[in-house]
Amino acid sequence: MSACSDFVEHIWKPGSCKNCFCLRSDHQPTAGHPKARANSLPAGTRLPARPENCRLDDEGVNGLAYSKPTIAVKPTMMTSETSDLWTEASLSAEVPKVNWRRTPGKLLLPKQEDEPIVYLGSFRGLQKPASPLACTDGNSRCPPAYTMVGLHNLEARVDRNTAFQPVSFQEEKAGREELPSAHESFRQKLAAFAGMTSSCPKGPRPCTSPQPLRESLPSEDDSDQRCSPSGDSEGGEYCSILDCCPESKDAVHSTEGSGRRGGDCSPTCREQGPRTRPTEEEKQGLSFPRECCGQGSTANPPRLGPKKPSLNSEAASSSDGLSCGSSRSGASSPFAPHLENDYCSLVKEPASGKQQDLSGHFLTSGKCVGQAAELQPASLLRDPVQPEPIYAESAKRKKAAPGPPRPEPKKEQVPAGHSQGQVWTGDTWIQKTPPSWSQDREGANPAPQVATTITVIAAHPEEDHRTIYLSSPDSAVGVQWPRGPSNQDLQAGEEEPLVAQGLTSRESHPHNVTENTAKEKPAIPPKLSKSSPGGSPVSPAPPLTDHSDGNTGGSSVGPQLLSRVPANLTSSCHTNGVATAGDSAKCPPPATSSSVLDQRRPRYQTGAWSRQCRIEEEEEVGQELSQSWGRELENGTADHSNSSTWHRLHPIDGTSGQNSKTNSGMSKSASFAFEFPKDRGRLEAFSPPPPPPKSRHLLKMNKSSSDLEKVSQSSAESLSPSFRGAHVSFTTGSTDSLASDSRPCSDGGPSYEPTHSPTISGKKLFAPVPFPSGSTEDVSPGGGPAQPPPLPQKKIVSRAASSPDGFFWTQGSPKPRTASPKLNLSHSETNVCAHDEPPFNCSLNSGNRSHHVFSSSEPLGKAFKGNAPWAPALGLANSKGGCGSPSLQCRAATSTSSSQLSVSSQASSSSTQLQLHSLLSSISSKEGTYAKLGGLYTQSLARLVTKCEDLFMGGQKKELRFNENYWSLFKLTCNKPCCDSGDAIYYCATCSEDPGSIYAVKICKTPEPKSASYCSPSVPVHFNIQQDCGHFVASVPSSMLASPDTSSKDTAPAVSPQPPAQEQDCVVVITREVPHQTASDFVRDSMASHRAEPEVYERRVCFLLLQLCNGLEHLKEHGIIHRDLCLENLLLAHCNPQSSPGPSATPTVPTTTSRCPSAAPAATTACQGGPGEKQLPRLIISNFLKAKQKPGGTTNLQQKKSQARLAPEIVSASQYRKFDEFQTGILIYELLHQPNPFEVRAQLRERDYRREDLPPLPTLSLYSPGLQQLAHLLLEADPIKRIRIGEAKRVLQCLLWGPRRELVEQPCTSEEVLCNTLHNWIDMKRALMMMKFAEKAVDRRRGVELEDWLCCQYLASAEPGALLQSLKLLQLL
């Protein structure tokens, strides 16, 4: 470490100075060879050197040149004296201590004289004898390959309430020359333990080279200590021992002393049973509640170079969760080769002639290079040193779900001779003590705290291979996102890493299992489940087929994400916080989950990844979806491990050309916004803000899945184009909601397996992603069984049942694992909003890189297309979300997800019972029953109106905004204009970013300076108001501005101007509604039909006028007066809800384009005038250049002050108050093929006219008198007498749907009797309407039409008083 004292806030990269973030080589000369430190103890006799003096940086080996991951760390004072960067909050017994282990910048083969390095985590100086932890190697000596032992907050039983002091890198702390008494005692403990653990089995079971111990640092607020397996809250802290035993069989014996030095607890060696190795040395099962022992003798030079332990950034550090990098992962390990069994304390199972997998490789990111090499000392290092993983853990403090405050770990059935307190970890028994509850920071709250941990681990920091592990035990959030390397070193002897979440069932790796382990039953993973209470026997997990290379022997442990596991670490698969993922490592049942979790607020760490992940955890203690979808397919091996919350993505380095594959799966327990920049190589630190508490959002995958796959497509040779090695497995198990439906997979309950891989879920939202033929997804290199047994089906009670957006992934019917991974969003039609491009548009070449995090409830601000907020659940059973291509271009409609349906049914069950009881209370009374039926019809029609609006509006209710930057993305689909209105010419166009939708390019005819001020009304989207999706000035060919009539030849084929064409700057408006004609065209073309079928035509005119009134009423509600209502400004668009986005999986196609299946036919149809005339067209009000907005509608304070000085007549805009009504009266004449009366009779404008002065309309149908009366009412010369647009709408409704004159022409009827009659009529019409909808619902040939929607609007709001007033206006009374 450099002695640099310049501290800057920057991004630290491995090999960089932690103070100034420059290269370490800039300050520090590289020593030629590691030398024995002055105060280092002799091997086997001396205490391990003080961490301050253990300078891994001085080892004299240049660091590897690889793209170093960036870790965002707080600018904290780093000690310059120690390369191991100890951050000591305090070594006193009261305060836990944080270790900042610094990654050695050099990788070297340690010399014999190097002593093991022991990292002491926070411990509270309470002494406790530790049960033996076996150095699983057969050698009795563990070489000193930089054994790094991290002991995390081992709290003293005496001081429970001591709040953890914030980590401070003060020089006085790091520079202290004298060890505190606690430190001294710990050194004695280490010496004692070194003697204990030095006995590593030889040869056949070599200890792997020291894996950098990635233990999480306790957060500042990590006052609450984890539940340790020891009952007295000290044992079983998250201690991890990095075993550094050379692969050579003649490992030099390290410190042998096993006595309790200085009264410190000395680990006791315990015989664990006969070994299958030649060296029948005892297996040392050490449960170090408080001591972490550094193993490794300096005498024997290990082959394995010391690996660079990654510095856990403070934000990412978890006090208990031990993030460990293991060399067994198929991904490039950050550590040197031959790191087989990284932690002696972890389970290491001797396999005859084969290397044993270390169960508990939390992140096995390195290839299993040492498997055969360990067994064969002559074998050379085959795996280049891999970059270290990056771990980021974030915990948030939350109250545990009510439950027993001190749950006891379940007894595991163990062979005779092993006490109940001992826990079998693979082949090592570890002393297991009852978990102790650590107090809250204040210590005031004795109730257990449940912590939510998010662990972000970029296991492969190098450019081509990155894995991000996101895990949260509490909120059931776990994501591992591996990016397979483009060029992985596929070694013939290397085994594809098998990622076992906590254990591989003993049948999985029979060749790796010792006799001892074969007899043991797997235990529950540390991810605790309420469903398996303490004391209940643990049933063995169903065996999962091991597809790892049989030749390499030990199953390679794939990258395994271990978030803060419950304190019952030693008893759980995670030995000392390390997930034991050994071949058949069995983990005893952990302590119950909800009580033992870390309770810290979420902290986000960027693991050197150019992708950005945000997890919004849900702080919820209620039931959570306990399904775990982590599917481990390292060579098709499915090892379901401890926690249902673990989501494991295993990038596998296929040996001998194996394709590295990973499963992709997602579970909803948190909102994920994966924003991936298009430049993968660009390293950027991203620290998302903490999510709002109690917030649940839909899976915000704003970036298209192309980004997901781009993240994972780094493995060029092995993964399919669409999903190269990207496996996003989000399992949804939550530690505090596993009560009734999920036991951890390692619990082995045969009834179900929480680790359901989303790829095998029955209901897939996305189509399978094909992998190349060479894929060995389900075929092990050794020819092992291809598929694990089908997962048993279980019934899930989702925590998302209360999710407002109903977005959760529920577990589908279990199926055998499919060969090709699918990005499966579960079975519910998740509310995935299309944004900027389809949410999972997994086309590899998608150019869209803009990211916008949005929820399903918020408007699609910049999206190219929206989703229907209500879409009928798309076949909740097995809808594929409309994803039909391998590129997963799925536009998942925001549909009512199955969770929402179940939630509504569950939540409303009680209210429904009450409502039913109320409805049936007066069942004996016919009048009361009819009255209640009428109310039910009214409510149903109101709901139908809303659903019809969603059906007809489709995805257009979401607002879109295009700017000039998108102009080049649009391409015309037809050379001819689709419509020529009064102010603009419309062309059909498609956007390259959204090829499935058709837009209208409106090129304004008015000069650019005048039309540049064009602004659409600032009103919400309405069915009858033209929606401005963006307007800007653009250069267009002059030929495009020519009228279709005058343009005899095709215009430019595209919007881009042709070189010879003369360009003109015009205002271009992008709209969703593609008109096919104006009302003027409609009137001109329908003269013959009006004469032939006057009633049909005039009824259609009534519908057009009704839509006009609806639009004008919407504008007036927002204080806007159009002032330019003419036939040319009224556009007609085709409306066909059957192909609208509501019921379909592609909700973004505008309804106006439903007239044809594809863009080109749509444009052609538009140019030719559209389909048959039977369908009612959609009327759209356009051209707001003359529109006025009433004063007072602004929110600008200055404008409000100015308007406060206006005269009343100006403020009231009395001259414009009923301006649109008057123009609507004129339109009635023009629509009925009559001239404007004020053009024919100019004298009407010069004097006050009366109704009789207006020209009469010809009576051709039963609608003619009503239209004549309505025109007179709208053309009243006195604005006060002129009816409002709302009244005109109700008059039109009466004309269209009644009541008829016969109903009200009863002599001598009072108004009260007439009102009762009208009330009964409304009830009858509502019942008939409900019947009509019911019949159309089951008739596929018939669909809901625009007329039905308009009628629903009328009947839903009709009431006798308004009907009576309308009848009077029509002079029907």
From Swiss-Prot:
- Describe how it is modified after translation: Phosphorylated by CSK on Tyr-238, Tyr-343, and Tyr-391; Tyr-391 is a primary site of phosphorylation.
| Cited InterPro entries | Kinase-like_dom_sf (IPR011009), MitoQC_Scaffold_Kinases (IPR051511), Prot_kinase_dom (IPR000719), Tyr_kinase_AS (IPR008266)
Q: List, alphabetically, the SMART domains matched.
A: S_TKc
- Indicate, by first and last residue, each region the UniProt record lists as having compositional bias (Basic and acidic residues): 250-263, 272-284, 506-522
Key word Nucleus present = yes
What are the protein's UniProt keywords?
Cell junction, Cytoplasm, Nucleus, Phosphoprotein
Biological processes annotated in GO = cell migration; negative regulation of neuron projection development; positive regulation of Rho protein signal transduction; regulation of cell motility; regulation of cell shape; regulation of Notch signaling pathway
This protein's major location comes to: cytoplasm
One Gene Ontology cellular component annotation held by this UniProt entry: nucleus
Does the UniProt entry include the keyword Ion transport?
A: no
Compositionally biased residues, Polar residues: 419-438, 568-578, 655-670, 711-721, 729-740, 1041-1050
Q: Which SUPFAM superfamilies match?
A: Protein kinase-like (PK-like)
Q: Where are the transmembrane segments?
A: none
Q: At which residues is Phosphotyrosine found?
A: Y238, Y343, Y391
The cellular location(s) given in this protein's UniProt record come to:
Cytoplasm; Nucleus; Cell junction, Focal adhesion
**Domain Protein kinase stretches:** 945-1296
For region Required for homodimerization, the annotated ranges are 911-954, 1298-1373
Residues modified to Phosphoserine: S671, S720, S757, S802
Segments of this protein annotated with the region Disordered? 31-50, 197-235, 250-338, 376-448, 468-794, 804-823, 1041-1062, 1138-1171
Instruction: Give the protein's biological function.
Output: Catalytically inactive protein kinase that acts as a scaffold protein. Functions as an effector of the small GTPase RND2, which stimulates RhoA activity and inhibits NGF-induced neurite outgrowth. Promotes Src family kinase (SFK) signaling by regulating the subcellular localization of CSK, a negative regulator of these kinases, leading to the regulation of cell morphology and motility by a CSK-dependent mechanism. Acts as a critical coactivator of Notch signaling.
Q: Which family does it belong to?
A: Belongs to the protein kinase superfamily.
**UniProt domain comment:** The dimerization region encompasses helices both from the N- and C-terminal of the protein kinase domain.
Oligomer status and interactors: Homodimer. Dimerization leads to the catalytic activation of CSK. Interacts (via C-terminus) with RND2. Interacts with CSK (via SH2 domain) in a Tyr-391 phosphorylation-dependent manner; this interaction potentiates kinase activity of CSK. Interacts with NOTCH1 intracellular domain (N1ICD). Forms a complex with PRAG1, N1ICD and MAML1, in a MAML1-dependent manner.
User: Would you tell me the protein name for this molecule?
Assistant: Inactive tyrosine-protein kinase PRAG1
| Phylogenetic lineage | Eukaryota, Metazoa, Chordata, Craniata, Vertebrata
The protein's gene is named Prag1
